[in-house]
Amino acid sequence: AAVPSGASTGIYEALELRAVEHINKTIAPALVSKLAMQEFMILPVGASSFRIGAEVYHNLKDATNVGDEGGFAPNILENKEALELLKAGYTDQVVIGMDVAASEFYRFTASAGIQVVGDDLTVTNPKRAASEKSCNCLLLKVNQIGSVTESLQACKLAQSNGWGVMVSHRSGETEDTFIADLVVGLCTGQIKTGAPCRSERYNQILRIEEELGSKSFRNPLAK
């Protein structure tokens, strides 16, 4: 029930909402959006360069807010609306990645042709994740695992189970470019390092590509 917080019962009196029902039906809907996804990411799987990802990113220029990792944080309420924003005219070359933070998504690994990337699960207990087939790709965060040696071991464990490996930064970390060298050295073919405006790692990958020349990795799905 709505109970006046003081002696006055006037229309401007602040109300103290004591019942849990008010929290569930009044407060929560006003504060929490309907998005079930933490992040929507662009994966230019058919690209031969960074251009496609950058163009999709710039297609979102009307969004006003920018998140911690350089991604746009527009005021949207539904998942479908977020997916519509990511359209930029490419077909069969760009796919959408979603950070859903859902413990139930492991069921998809056996029934659907999608990549399910394990985050905290693979850091805390990678052997259990592999044995239970909870996911099919490792999100490799060096500063979360603890050391480069342990990161290499985790990568080998994942690959020995037929998993993919995605090298990743962590929110709030420095501009150090080491993970760009790591993703090339491990030949994982996947990196998660924020939006193009956070360009340090992308520039390092471009420098590596320039140095390697014809020996550099080429996306087999590029058109």
Curated annotation (Swiss-Prot):
Keyword Glycoprotein listed: no
Pathway the protein acts in: Carbohydrate degradation; glycolysis; pyruvate from D-glyceraldehyde 3-phosphate: step 4/5
N6-malonyllysine: residues bearing it: 87, 215
GO molecular function: magnesium ion binding; phosphopyruvate hydratase activity
Enzyme class: lyase
Any single Pfam family the record assigns to this protein: Enolase_C
Name used for this protein in its record: Alpha-enolase
Subunit structure: Mammalian enolase is composed of 3 isozyme subunits, alpha, beta and gamma, which can form homodimers or heterodimers which are cell-type and development-specific. ENO1 interacts with PLG in the neuronal plasma membrane and promotes its activation. The C-terminal lysine is required for this binding. Interacts with ENO4 and PGAM2. Interacts with CMTM6.
Coarse class of the protein's main subcellular location: cytoplasm
InterPro entries, per database record: Enolase, Enolase-like_C_sf, Enolase-like_N, Enolase_C, Enolase_CS
N6-acetyllysine: modified positions: 25, 61, 87, 133, 141, 215
